[in-house]
Amino acid sequence: MKRFIIGISAIILLLFIGFVAVFYGGFYVDSGRDNHVNTFVRTENKEILIKDKDEWKPFEVRGMDMGSGIPGEWSTDYAITKETYLHWFQLIQEAGANTLRVYSVQNPSFYKAFYEYNSQHEEPLYLLQGIWVNDYIQNSRVDAYADSFAGKLLDNCLVTVDVIHGKRLIINNDADTSTGLYLHDVSKWVLGYIIGNGWEDTTVAYTDEKYPDMEPYKGTYLTASKDASAFESLLAETGDKMLHYESTRYDEQRLISFSSGNATDPFDYPKEIAEYFRKCARIDTEHITATDKFISGQFASYSASPYDQDYFSCMEYTTWNSLSDKKIDFSDCITPDGKRNTYRAYLRLLNEHHTMPVLAVEFGAATGRGEIQENPVTSRGLGYYSEKEQGKILVDCYEDIMAAGLSGG
């Protein structure tokens, strides 16, 4: 009997160690089958394509951002229930959206609800899974190559891969993500990853100034070009290691993107404009290129809120083209009565700059009692709208997004 108890105890201990190693430590054995990596989504020139049986079909992203907070709870408590998520998913799909975007790993209830909802619907919702570094780290004194920044970002990337495949235990992650046991594999509905959520421009600028002569990163899946800055090279390295992890552990790939916004857009503005808006940093994902081993592809993602700082409103219409190497047609950005649609014009500039698909991953209008800011040209602001007015602004923004040539938003 004593030997039996010892034997059972040893088996339980080994199972526990194995569980912790796989679900908490990320332990796996490399399959070594690089030529067997699969994907159901890829890019081709400026289009996103989804595999439907044996046919690749263009996919227009009609998305909705989803935060982690509800009234009466801190967003970092991740307090939304499965039942609430299921109700929201139904409403979101009825509104015409086909994609969700979340900023970080949500609570296990989200992935359980997402799995359950899609398993019961012929037309699924897709997911763009975000990964971030928290604001405390981004606004600290360190540059992006400090372990508290680069190391934490990479850790979050690898944890996120395990989460969407239903193989992760998160005990404590400094509020960067929720916690819990993730057992639902939702990977077949995950279009891709968006790394970052609005990089702090001063951190980007500080990193680039500190390492002006850094050798560009050369990876297996992603490579930084000779023109890449130090921060862009860090992004290439992070994305490359994330792709390696998913490719070798799960034999899968999906799209990848590095978030940006107008504070870090790739354009070189006139001196007076840059000084007025305190524009100090640039991120150009065209400086991050894919190798043949990255079969899914990249897309460019921008926060494109209509009330954000509007460089074009301070520039003459005739000077907009000075920001591009191409001759861009902005004629439909001027109404018959002479009003300028600087929102559409800026999005077109972004789209024409890139060789990859471009998504506006964050835009909208709020219904709060007070208005924080308003675009002086388009009169689209943040707050003080009725729900009807809010809906009209959302429709107008989306029409501008598609008219500018983006792949959705």
Q: Model-predicted segments: where are they?
A:
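Histidine/acidic-residue-rich catalytic or RNA/ligand-binding cores of hydrolases
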Residues: 369-379
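Active-site region of glycoside hydrolase catalytic domains
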Residues: 120-334, 348-370, 402-408
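Acidic-and-aromatic substrate-binding clefts and catalytic sites of carbohydrate-active enzymes
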Residues: 79, 101-112, 263-267, 307-310, ...
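Short, acidic/polar
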Residues: 74-92, 272-291, 388-398
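Membrane-interface motif at the C-terminal end of an N-terminal transmembrane signal
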Residues: 15-34, 310
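Active-site-adjacent substrate/metal-binding segments within catalytic domains
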Residues: 26-119
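N-terminal Sec-pathway targeting helices
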Residues: 1-16, 20
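Aromatic/hydrophobic pocket-lining residues that form the small-molecule binding cavity
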Residues: 85, 111, 153, 157, ...
